A protein has these predicted regions:
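C-terminal lobe and adjacent flexible extensions of AdoMet/dcAdoMet transferase-like proteins
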Residues: 205-244
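SAM-dependent methyltransferase
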Residues: 141-209
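Conserved class I S-adenosyl-L-methionine
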Residues: 1-41
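Class I SAM-dependent methyltransferase SAM/SAH-binding core
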Residues: 52-97
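A short acidic, Gly/Pro-enriched loop at the edge of an enzyme's catalytic core
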Residues: 96-106
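A short glycine-rich, Lys/Arg-flanked "PGG" loop and its adjoining helix->strand segment in the class I
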Residues: 124-136
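Class I SAM-dependent methyltransferase "Motif I" SAM/SAH-binding loop
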Residues: 47-51
């Protein structure tokens, strides 16, 4: 089983509990301030997880589809949407194989959901799938890490006490252009192990991959505050469109 098939569930939510609805709303506000779409736009939230951004967009009246591989996270998204009386469309599939063509005005991918696969060819398939799913002149936003920032600010090990019953140890290292993480979780006396491994692409590498997929990069931001992208930026936020 690949790491991303095992990891994205309730334990993942515990580790990233600070990634909440308030943060999602701020990021959606940034998105809509930097992309022009109609009020009835069709939006694909690719790797939607527990639905934070899908729900924020749906509350604004957009026609949203959330897609993820994790049944567990989709169930959480479904429950959260129901609590808000939202009829949110959710679909389970691999991001390389989304079955849509010329369907969406906008595809978004938040919080480093690109670079999961072992080879560049497999990661490239994600961009081909995004391009295929977009309408002509459709737009995309990919929220990705800045490899320079990751390398310069790597915390090799940290420990967190999430609650009286849950503690987490995270160990990080860079190898073969990938940022790797081992997560050890002690939960109610039980020790659980998980991993993350994400390919670190430079901006130039991603530009080439986008071009191969028929996508044009129009603007790169360094964070959700709208700052310009540079080597010290925390994020690499890519905004662009499908070539006509």
């Amino acid at each position: 089983m690949d790491w991303y098939e095992k990891w994205f569930g309730k334990e993942y939510i515990l580790v990233y509990h600070h990634r909440n609805e308030s943060e999602a709303k701020q990021q959606v506000d940034f998105l809509l301030n930097h992309i022009s779409i109609s009020k009835n736009a069709k939006i694909l939230d690719l790797c939607c997880g527990n639905g934070r951004h899908s729900i924020a967009l749906k509350k604004l009246g957009y026609d949203v589809l959330g897609v993820d591989l994790s049944s567990e996270l989709l169930d959480i998204a479904r429950s959260k949407a129901s609590e808000s009386n939202l009829d949110l469309k959710l679909y389970r599939c691999d991001m390389r194989e989304i079955p849509y063509e010329n369907e969406f005005d906008l595809v978004v991918q938040f919080f480093t959901s690109f670079g999961y696969f072992d080879t560049d060819a497999e990661n490239q398939k994600v961009l081909f799938a995004i391009s295929k799913a977009l309408k002509e002149n459709g737009q995309f936003m990919i929220d990705y890490m800045n490899p320079d920032y990751v390398m310069d600010n790597l915390v090799e090990k940290d420990e967190k006490q999430i609650s009286a019953e849950i503690s987490i140890i995270q160990e990080r290292w860079i190898e073969n252009s990938r940022i790797n993480k081992k997560i050890t979780m002690i939960k109610n006396g039980e020790t659980l192990f998980y991993n993350e491994s994400v390919r670190m692409y430079s901006l130039q590498e991603i530009k080439c991959m986008l071009n191969q997929a028929g996508l044009m990069l129009n603007k790169t931001y360094g964070n959700f505050d709208g700052s310009e992208y540079n080597k010290d930026s925390m994020r690499m936020i890519l905004i662009g469109s499908k070539n006509p």
